[in-house]
Amino acid sequence: MPSKSIADHHAGYGVALAIVALLLIHGTALVMIFSDIKVGSQPQDLKDQLSYPSNYDAYTSHISGADHGHSEMWTDINPPSRKPLHGDSLDIKTNEEHITLSSPRTSTKTTNENGHEKDSKDIKFSFSTNRHPISVSPTTDIVSIAVSHNNPMGGDTWQVSRNGPNTVHVPIYGKPILRLNGEELSTQIAHMSMWDELAGSFKTFAATAESFHMITTTHLFNKTLHKDVFFVVHGWHGITNDTHIFLSAVRLLTRMMPTSCIIYLSWESQGAIGTAADAILLARRVNITQFLSAMPSQLRIHCMGHSLGSYVCGSICRQYHSLMSGICKGILGINPYEVLFSAPDLYARMHVDTIRLDAEYVAIFATTSQYLSTSDSDADEYIIVNDAVFMNSVCANPYEWNIHLCTTGYGELKSCERFGAANVTTSPGVVEDGSQICLRMLPIIAVLQSLDLKSSYPLLRIAPPDASNEVTHLPSIWNIYVVGKDYRYSTYAKNDSLWYSSAICAGDTGFSIPSVFTVFAPPSISLRVRAAVQQSSTIYKNITIYSAFLKNTSRYYPTVTLETLGPILSAYAWRGRMHNSSYYPLPLPEQEIMEYKCTHIDRTYTCIPTDLIYATTVWRQIFSMGHIFPVYPSNNCLPYRPTNAIIWRRPVLEIGVWNNITASFQRNKQLMALTFENHNTATNTTLLTFHDVCRESKIRSVVYFEYDWLETSMNITVLIPGLYTLRWFFPFEIIEMPVRVSYNNSFAQALTTSRV
C-alpha cells in the first residue's frame, strides 16, 4: 500500500482536529499513558542476537480479499515514508504534542489503529550522558530477554533468557485444586443420559463404572473420536422439573460437538428434589466417582451447570482431581444463584465453598447482577447479559412460550431444537408463575445459541460494584467454546475476577446477538444512542467513549441515530463471531468491525455503515473438534490488529547511538503492541504484542529491546544512526514518538578506544 501523508491519512477528521486545537489553546493538559520515559546510557556488553522466525500466521491465505485479521503483521499500519537522509526531520514540531484520530483505509485491509483508557500521566524525558553500564537482571516471573555482559564489539548483540522470549510465567495463576473425601459424598447413585444418534433415542444409566464400560462397548463413547467429556447438569428441582429442556440441550450439543462425549447428569436422588436449603448443601456431595474411575485419564473434562448444577460441576471436578490427579478444563455456571430467589437467606452458604478453584477456567453466565458483588469469588469471568426487555416479551404467554433454536457450527454442522413451556413440568400441588419458569430457562438457551459460529457474545469490561481503578470498556468475545481468559490483557496472568457486560435479543425463532456501537466524542457533549439495549460511557482524557448494545435482530449492521448536538469524532460498530475459513483452520473468536460515516441532521447524527469491514482476533483458548487450541505462541508473538484509536504524537527525541530509552507506564494500563519503524530502510517491525517479544531477524543489528512485563517497563537501544518512530498501542490510543539517533562524542570516543 502506498504511503500517505498525515493530512491525507486523516482526511475527513477536520472537526476532530479543530476540537483538539481548541483544547490545546485553552491550556487543557493532554494526559499521557506513560508515567516516565527516560534516556540513559546503554551498557555496551550486549550479546547473542534474537533470531526471529516467521510470523504466527502459517495458514493465512494470500488470496486478495481473504483477509480476516490474521494476515501478515502490521503490513498496512503506519506505512513508512520514503527513506530519509540523516539530516531529514519528520513533520512534527519539537516543542508540541499532537493528537488526532486514526482513520479507515480504503483497501481490503482496512485498519483503524487502537489504544486505552482512564487517567494517566504525561510522558517525561530526562537525558543522560552517563556512559556507565546500568545493571540489568533477568526477572524471575515473566522474562523475555536478559542482557549478557560480553564485549559489545564482538559477536551478536542479543541474548535470549533461559525461559525463552515468549514464555509467560504466571505468578499467582496456579489454582490449589481442592479434593473431596469419600465420606463426604452421597451414597445414592446419580443417573446419566446420552443421546444415541443411530437409535434416535436417549440412553439412561446409573453413574457407575459398569455403565461407562457399557457406553464404550455400544460406541456411545468412542475412544478414538471423543477427546472431551462434557457434563450437563440441571439445577434445583424442588418446584420445577426441567429435564426435557436439558435433554434437548444434550441432543443439540451432541450434534454440534461430535468429538465430545455429552452426558446429562441427573442428581434428583442425591438432593435436587429436596428443599432449597438441603439442595444447596447436597449439590457439593453428588457422587459419580465410580463412573469417573473407569474413564481414560487423558480425557479432558468440561461441565456446564444451571443454578445449583454449577456446584455439582465443582464436586465432579474435585472427584476427578482426587481420582486422576487431573484438573477440569472448564466449568460454565448459568445463573448459579438462581435458587436464592426462593431462599435469599442462603446466600452465605453458597459462598462458603467456591467453584473457582475446581477448574482451570470458570465462567458464570448470568442474566441478572443480583447477588453478584465484589465479594464473589466463584469465577474467573462473569458474563452479565441484559435480558429484561426481550426475555420478558418471549415469556409474555407463560404457558405457550416457544423458541426454535438453529445453529451452524464447524464443518457446516447444522442442528435445530425446539424449547418451550411443553418441556417443563411442576411438582404436584405446586403452583408457580409460568413466566418465572420461562425466564429461568431462557439463559440456558441463550448459552446454546453461542454454538453458532456467528453468535458469539460481544463483551465490554465493566467494573464490579464498589471497585476502583478498573479498566472498563475493554472489548472481548465469549461463547460456549471458550476455556480461557482473553490472552491480550494483563489480567490473563492474574487471579482477579473479570466482569463483562453483554446483551441479547430473544424471539420465537431464537436469539440474536446484538452489535456494539462505539462513538468517540468530546467530553462536554451529551449523547444518546437510539434503539440501544444498554449504553454506557467513560471519560478518557479529553475524549469520551460511548458504547451501546444495539437491539437489531438481523445479521446486518443498521443505520444508527445519535441524539446529540455534537460534534462527534469517530464511530464504528462491532460484533463477535468465530473464524471459519478453509485457509486458516484455527477456530478463534474474532471482533468483526464495521466503520460508520455520520452526518449531522438537525439535533441528531445519522450514522450509516460504510461496508468497510475488517476483523481482529480475540486470542482466547478454544476447545473444538477434538482439540484445545492454545493461544500463546510457540516461537513468535501473536498478531494484533487494532481497531479505532486516538493518536498522540510526541516531539522528536534526539539521542545518541547506544543511549538507552527506558519507558515505564502505569500498571493499570494495557499495552497491546509496540512497533519500530525504520525510516532509513522503509520498514516497520513489531517488537512485541501483548506479553510476548516478537522475533524478527531483520532488526538484529539495529535495535536492542528488553521488556519487563510485570514491572511494566522496557529498555530500547538503537544501534545505528538514523530516523525511527516508536509506536505504543493501547486499546483506545496510540503513542507515537519519533527518535533521531546520531553518533555523539562519547560514543565515538568509546568506539575509537575499542578499536585500538
Swiss-Prot record:
Keyword terms of this UniProt record: Glycoprotein, Secreted, Signal
Compartments, as annotated in UniProt: Secreted
GO cellular component annotations of the record: extracellular region
Compositionally biased spans, kind Polar residues: 100-113
Primary site of residence: secreted
InterPro entries: AB_hydrolase_fold
Residues carrying covalently attached carbohydrate according to the record: N222, N241, N287, N423, N495, N542, N552, N580, N660, N684, N715, N744
Domain of life from the UniProt record: Viruses
Signal peptide from the UniProt entry: 1-30
Annotated transmembrane regions: none
Annotated region described as Disordered, given as residue ranges: 96-120
Other noteworthy facts: The recombinant protein experimentally lacks lipase activity. Additionally, it possesses an uncharged asparagine instead of an aspartic acid residue at the catalytic-triad acid position found in conventional cellular lipases.
Function, in words: May play a role in host immune modulation since the protein is secreted and provides an advantage for growth in vivo while it is completely dispensable in cell culture.
Official protein name in the record: Virulence factor MDV010
Gene name linked to the record: MDV010
